[in-house]
């Protein structure tokens, strides 16, 4: 069965392309009525320095106080930058500041955010959609498309135009310190299908994307925020694996690609040269060989992976030379603009090179509606960012991701009338999962154990739990990057192995790689994986355990010899008599 999975996912990819292609807006670089006229009129009004500044996007927070906000407004007014990237803060504060910043900008700003799981990645009081690893388990990719559209709506409510998402890195290294849960998984076909659905949802809603991190950051063991990763793979390997999702999404009209800070000798042998600064990678490979016509966007230019070997603004200059259109988050934007201007005078950069990028940026602004800019209306904004239909979709996404491994024998046989032990591990207080499940199975007892509990307490609990007819064990871990480990003490790991040998259903509320660090989990009667430890996941599992919904998720990654990519039962429950109260 496993030998046929790549073929099945390829067929799935073709089907999703066919399904979505008829629904998409044309990319910004395709002909549009009135676009050339507006672009030319704006372009002609810009002086040489202002044209350079259009390529630079600056950082903006909404939680750093008035002095900081005034400094950003001054930089926008004086330097004439092309856009900004919002980070931490609140939605109302961001909307008010966006209106203020736009009011002093010569050309309407292209407003971006790194919002892989929605704007809650940066803003409080908003909906957090599932991580991409969770989405990788979903079999109905239309749900991911709908999520992309919902996130697109949120962007438009906040006057934003560009999402630095989706991540299309193939996470084939479980110890990856920077991607991991941000990836759809370790299968190139699944990553591509999911990435395409997310991209289409955003672009159909009128939001630009930036698929990342080109040419593929999934098999690294160095965080490019801190140092320069080196990818020592052949061109053939890169072409067949890492580049695959980028190639396919570019064919389908990706509006932007973010270039990673990595040294890749097979693509450019220059020592210590990040891919962001490589003309062979950005211009020859991305724009030439892959035919990309959208916005080439650097990863943050303040990261150590790019400035370590090219300090004092040299990285900014080289990023322009390499062929990037948008230079985001320079260490010093004013200095960078001056250095690029100097590089033009000395012949390192041609004026035509700048003009190409500026016109492309203006085309993207036109596509995003900035030719007809309107300030954000903050009336009922917080309510509109948390509508019932969006919250419902968020729960449906989690519902669709839950994966049943090993067997569904006890799931089908679970009897709400029998004495049931409901155990949560790795916590210090009763979980919502336990409280909700007890409402449905009143003939139950709740137990918990912290991740540093004593062996004496565990032995006493084990003796008590053995008196029960059936056991539901929940393993809780909030870590995003477990790297194939479970950070429980040794006695608790032994305790898990002993509990698994009882008549036990094990529920893993954690990143799937955590399973590799859970001893004896394969001895459980059934294993449920949720990918995250949040309220949505706990609600989903309660519904599955009590026969209220099926479980259809598949593992998006290979964990170990027991559990591999694509594993997961299609579990359809038989209706169970629910004795307790209904909380849904």
Where are these regions (language model features)?
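Short glycine-enriched loops at secondary-structure junctions
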Residues: 61-64, 113-121, 161-171, 211-217, ...
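Second-shell residues forming the walls of enzyme active-site clefts
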Residues: 47, 68, 84, 92-109, ...
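Preference for extracellular/luminal or secreted protein segments
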Residues: 22-58, 62-74, 288, 310-584
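A substrate-binding/cap region within the structured catalytic cores of diverse enzymes
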Residues: 138-160, 167-183, 188, 195, ...
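Short acidic, glycine-rich surface-loop motifs adjacent to enzyme active sites
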Residues: 53, 73-89, 174-175, 250-273, ...
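Acidic (Asp/Glu)-rich catalytic clusters
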Residues: 73-78, 98-106, 250-251, 461-466
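Bacterial Sec-dependent N-terminal signal peptides
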Residues: 1-27
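Loop/turn elements at helix/coil->beta-strand transitions in domains of secreted/extracellular proteins
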Residues: 48-54, 79-84, 105-110, 156-162, ...
